[in-house]
UniProtKB/Swiss-Prot annotation:
This is Ribosome maturation factor RimP. It comes from Bacillus velezensis (strain DSM 23117 / BGSC 10A6 / LMG 26770 / FZB42) (Bacillus amyloliquefaciens subsp. plantarum). Keywords: Cytoplasm, Ribosome biogenesis. GO terms for biological process: ribosomal small subunit assembly; translation. CDD domains: YlxS_C (cd01734).
Amino acid sequence: MSKKVTDTVQEMAQPILDDLQLELVDIEFVKEGQNWFLRVFIDSENGVDIEECAKVSEALSEKLDEADPITQNYFLEVSSPGAERPLKKKADFEKSLGKNVYMKTYEPIDGLKVFEGKLAEFDGQTVTIEMTVKTRKKRVNIPYEKIANARLAVTF
């Protein structure tokens, strides 16, 4: 159900975002407690502000009300993905070269399933993370298809 909803919402949202020159980062349709939430995460080269989120929310809400593809009552939230934005597409990895990332894999690679470090390289098939293990710097090559989830990581 959730995948069907997000696919439908993506089809409805994309023309709105294209008109505003915004990027669709992710869509979530989740139940938290008794309530359902439809979360749409948007971004652009220069980030997004509250006015852009409001424009997308109003336009998308109108389309959703017309088509009525979701049977449950839900809250629509449109926002920026934040500082720790998810890396979902290959283009996200390319744009994030040199930045700190946090990544989980489906199966262990070099004995680990969790990686945090600098995104050093991405060739479209393999992600190379430069990380510190104990006191040594280490480069780990992770096949793209083995990545369960990835996001930017804020370090202090």
